[in-house]
């Protein structure tokens, strides 16, 4: 038996049709309809989309003015994209860059590139560098330069200014003060321990004395007074001011130094004897005697000779010999001024005789 409401040939049942229409009328028009039952075909997308369009149109026509129209998610997304595109067109491009153009510049942004070249650090010029060096650093610089370039020794010796006597003596006094300053306080000044402490400074002092004495000897130094003044100061420092150490090595060194000093005195005083011109002997003796008297050399040499155990006796003898020769020359000159008969030479009027006969008045007519 067949159930009630079933019909062959696909004729719809009236009851089902009415129920379906009732459901269609009672459903909300705002909700999209994708199908009535699970038995409806889902394979045809075109029929479902067309039914969706018809349903939407029928729903929009049947709605009242108080009802709102619902949109599908796809349409809403498209409209949102359209609004965003429209808003993007109206907005200015690159808001960050455009806003920076209206910002007031700060102190760093006001910097303008200068047309002058960039200032960079530079080393000091050579003359400024030399000016900034002290004495010790300048000496070291010159010595290192000579060691690196030995060929500069002759050039520097030629162009270097000659030291004055006072400059030379100041340097010697500085070397001598180094000896005195290194003497021990709680020990005998003349002991061996004291000598060993000052030995390096003593050697430096004697070396400096030797170098400067050679610089003030003839023929390099032609001024006798300058040479004798320097020798006097050096002799005074070595004989009278330097402690007399009991060390045997020091005694031998001091004795040798005094012998050399005495020889230097003789070399300076006798420099005029080597000229070889006998005509100028009297004049040369007069120059030496004048220097001896002005500098009071005999008195000074006597003091040096007493302390040095007659080391300067030969210098004293030479000075006395020059004084005697000068006295003889003066006496011989006075004797030569007197003639052999003891008569005084005739006056100038007696030596001149003129014949006035040619200039007499009688001879004027013949002229």
From Swiss-Prot:
The reply on keyword Kinase is no
Question: Which keywords does the record carry?
Answer: Cytoplasm, Nucleus, Protein transport, Transport
Coiled coil ranges: none
Ranges annotated as biased composition (Basic and acidic residues) = 20-31
Record field: compositional bias (Polar residues): 63-75
Pfam families noted in UniProt: Cut8 (PF08559)
**Segments of this protein annotated with the region Disordered:** 1-93
Keyword Ligase assigned: no
Extract one GO BP annotation from the record: protein transport
Q: Where is the composition biased (Low complexity)?
A: 36-62
Q: Which GO terms describe its cellular component?
A: cytoplasm; nuclear membrane
The GO terms this record gives for MF are: proteasome binding
Q: Where in the cell is it found?
A: Cytoplasm; Nucleus
Q: Which InterPro entries match?
A: Cut8/Sts1_fam, Cut8/Sts1_sf
The protein's job, in short, is: Involved in ubiquitin-mediated protein degradation. Regulatory factor in the ubiquitin/proteasome pathway that controls the turnover of proteasome substrates. Targets proteasomes to the nucleus and facilitates the degradation of nuclear proteins.
Q: What PANTHER family does the entry give?
A: FI02826P
Q: Family, per the entry?
A: Belongs to the cut8/STS1 family.
Q: Assembly state and interactors?
A: Binds the proteasome.
* UniProt-recorded name of the protein: Tethering factor for nuclear proteasome STS1
- Species of the source: Candida tropicalis (strain ATCC MYA-3404 / T1)
Q: Which gene encodes it?
A: STS1
């Amino acid at each position: 038996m067949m159930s009630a409401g079933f019909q062959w040939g696909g004729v719809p049942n009236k009851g089902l049709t009415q129920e379906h229409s009732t459901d269609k009328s009672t459903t909300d028009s705002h909700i999209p309809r994708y199908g009535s039952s699970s038995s409806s075909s889902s394979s045809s997308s075109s029929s479902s989309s067309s039914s969706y369009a018809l349903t939407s149109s029928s729903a929009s026509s049947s709605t009242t003015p108080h009802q709102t129209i619902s949109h599908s998610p796809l349409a809403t997304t498209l409209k949102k994209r359209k609004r965003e595109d429209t808003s993007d067109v109206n907005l200015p491009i690159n808001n960050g860059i455009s806003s920076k153009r209206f910002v007031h510049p700060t102190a760093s942004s006001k910097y303008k590139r200068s047309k002058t070249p960039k200032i960079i650090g530079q080393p000091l010029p050579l003359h400024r560098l030399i000016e900034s060096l002290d004495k010790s650093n300048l000496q070291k610089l010159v010595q290192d330069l000579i060691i690196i370039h030995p060929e500069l020794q002759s050039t520097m010796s030629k162009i270097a200014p000659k030291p004055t006597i006072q400059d030379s003596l100041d340097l010697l006094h500085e070397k001598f003060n180094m000896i005195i300053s290194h003497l021990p306080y709680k020990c005998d000044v003349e002991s061996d321990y004291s000598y060993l402490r000052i030995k390096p400074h003593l050697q430096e002092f004697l070396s400096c004395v030797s170098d400067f004495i050679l610089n003030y000897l003839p023929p390099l130094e032609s001024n006798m007074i300058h040479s004798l003044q320097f020798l006097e100061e050096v002799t005074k420092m070595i004989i009278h001011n330097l402690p007399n150490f009991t060390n045997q090595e020091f005694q031998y060194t001091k004795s040798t130094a005094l012998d050399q000093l005495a020889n230097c005195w003789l070399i300076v005083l006798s420099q005029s004897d080597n000229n070889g011109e006998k005509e100028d002997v009297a004049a040369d003796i007069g120059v030496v005697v004048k220097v001896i008297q002005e500098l009071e050399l005999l008195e000074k040499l006597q003091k040096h000779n007493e302390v040095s155990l007659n080391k300067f006796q030969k210098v004293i003898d030479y000075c006395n010999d020059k004084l005697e020769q000068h006295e003889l020359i003066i006496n011989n000159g006075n004797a030569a001024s007197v003639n052999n008969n003891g008569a005084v030479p005739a006056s100038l009027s007696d030596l001149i005789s003129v014949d006035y006969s040619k200039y007499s008045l009688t001879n004027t007519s013949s002229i």
